[in-house]
């Protein structure tokens, strides 16, 4: 089975399958790509703490795939998979999306009040906001370094891993600050007449964990 596939958006899937049983550990693995409509594929939704099923569990029962669906050379799928994951890690870190979230956070903190003062005027919350702005800027420049290296044909290496981890952590911290800035209303999620932004901040807080 394959856990956490986005079948909601995908009609193709790739799999790493062992095609040479006697080959060494990372050898004898082939990289296949084929349709999600292939007979024998079953998709089961995985409901998360958000209450939604953004990811799915995919099961394969006697699935048969034509040999021409192999990507690259037979038995060399491990190298193809590493290249795929390298690009995926770089794509998962999106500083522009985080900057948009920060702008929305600033607007929220200017509107929400803690006691008689705006949330953005609270020194502790403001310090957290400034720290997040600095972290997102650093992540953006790290992304530029990765792009520059890629254009020169150099591998991203550990820098891509840093971007992926940093992106997830910063997204969660931004949502956490928004919830704290809302005060007691920050615990409200869906189906509440007083929820803010449709419960998006709470949803993101749980999704980015």
Per-segment meaning from a language model:
Residues 2-3, 195-209:
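Short, intrinsically disordered, charge-balanced linker/junction segments flanking boundaries
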Residues 4-44:
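A short core secondary-structure module
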Residues 18-22, 35, 39, 61, ...:
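Short, well-ordered loop/turn and helix-capping segments at boundaries between secondary-structure elements
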Residues 29, 55, 75, 160-162, ...:
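Active-site lining segments that contact anionic ligands and/or coordinate catalytic metals
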Residues 4-7, 49-50, 209:
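Glycine-rich phosphate/pyrophosphate-binding beta-alpha loops
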């Amino acid at each position: 089975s394959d856990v956490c596939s986005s079948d909601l958006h995908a009609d193709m899937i790739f799999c790493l399958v062992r095609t040479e049983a006697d080959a060494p550990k990372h050898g004898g693995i082939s990289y296949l790509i084929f349709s999600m409509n292939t007979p024998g594929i079953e998709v089961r939704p995985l409901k998360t703490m958000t209450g939604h099923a953004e990811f799915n569990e995919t099961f394969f029962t006697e699935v048969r795939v034509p040999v021409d669906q192999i990507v690259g050379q037979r038995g060399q799928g491990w190298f193809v998979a590493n290249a795929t994951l390298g690009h995926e890690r770089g794509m998962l870190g999106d500083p522009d999306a985080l900057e948009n979230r920060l702008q929305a956070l600033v607007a929220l903190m200017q509107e929400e009040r803690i006691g008689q003062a705006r949330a953005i005027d609270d020194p502790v919350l403001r310090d957290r906001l400034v720290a997040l702005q600095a972290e997102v800027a650093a992540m953006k420049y790290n992304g530029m370094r990765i792009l520059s290296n890629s254009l020169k044909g150099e591998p991203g290496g550990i820098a891509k891993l840093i971007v992926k981890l940093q992106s997830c952590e910063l997204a969660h911290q931004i949502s956490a600050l928004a919830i704290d800035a809302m005060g007691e209303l920050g615990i409200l999620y869906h189906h509440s007449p007083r929820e803010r932004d449709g419960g998006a901040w709470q949803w993101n807080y749980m999704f980015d964990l």
